[in-house]
Amino acid sequence: MKVIIGLGNPGKKYEDTRHNAGFMAIDKISDKWGIPVTQNKFRALVGEGRIEGEKVLLVKPQTYMNLSGESVAEVLKFYKLIPDDLVVIYDDLDLPTGHLRLREKGSAGGHNGIKSMIQHLGTQEFKRIKVGISRPEPGRSVSDYVLNTFPVAERADIQEAVSLAADACAMWTRESFLKVMNHFNSLKK
């Protein structure tokens, strides 16, 4: 089984915010592959299904971003899986809005959700799909920025990125992550 985790904050008020790019990607996968993400387990909304024949578990932690690792660790423990069985999709301030970057491992890079995952999984070695949200203009607080919605001018870019993230996850069900990474990291915007 492959586990696809999207990071975000629960609740209507955070629904279309920059920090919820991971949740947006899970919603896209859910819609595209007909996998409802409605079960409340592991302090998360989860959905089990198949993508191209491979069993997958879609996960949207409901712990708020900074505690995401607690929920993810519960999922892995219950299913007796290891970090190599998962990919996490999340927002990245250091990428232009709408760009993707896939990595096999790495540091938290200042992202509190990833910091929590590293802490609770005990490793930095898990796959990532970063969705670019750009940095705020000088003088604007980062926390205010990530908790606001995308302006109209950026919505098409973010929807395209979320769609590509969903495609990357589907490809991962049948190919090595290295191959997926090489393909999607080479796409030009």
Curated annotation (Swiss-Prot):
TRNA binds at residues 14, 64, 66, 112. The active site is at residue 19. The record marks 91 as: Stabilizes the basic form of H active site to accept a proton. It is found in: Cytoplasm. InterPro entries: Pept_tRNA_hydro, Pept_tRNA_hydro_CS, Pept_tRNA_hydro_sf. Keywords: Cytoplasm, Hydrolase, RNA-binding, tRNA-binding. It catalyses: an N-acyl-L-alpha-aminoacyl-tRNA + H2O = an N-acyl-L-amino acid + a tRNA + H(+). GO terms for cellular component: cytoplasm. Transmembrane segments: none annotated. Monomer. PANTHER family: PEPTIDYL-TRNA HYDROLASE. Belongs to the PTH family. This is Peptidyl-tRNA hydrolase.
